[in-house]
A protein has these predicted regions:
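Non-catalytic structural scaffold of enzyme domains
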Residues: 1-74
Length: 74
């Protein structure tokens, strides 16, 4: 039997908990890491380059820390 997957859910604002709830419903056996970026909210007030400059390194750090099998950006 294989180990349950680890799923990282990155919430960029509103709606991430709804996404997480649906994923948990589909995969109740998985391990979860949920991270909300409240400090940069709302993302709509930032330009594309600014968002990329923030999110790419942050997701990289989260992947290194949690070693997920799947990353969901909500």
């Amino acid at each position: 039997m294989t180990a349950p997957p680890t799923i990282l859910v990155f919430d960029s604002g509103l709606g991430g908990l709804t996404v997480l709830r649906e994923i948990v419903s589909a995969r109740p056996d998985a391990h979860y890491a949920y991270v909300a970026d409240d400090a940069f909210f709302p993302y709509g007030h930032h330009g594309e380059d600014e968002i990329i400059a923030r999110v790419v390194p942050l997701i990289g750090e989260l992947i290194a820390a949690h070693r997920p099998d799947l990353v969901v950006i909500a």
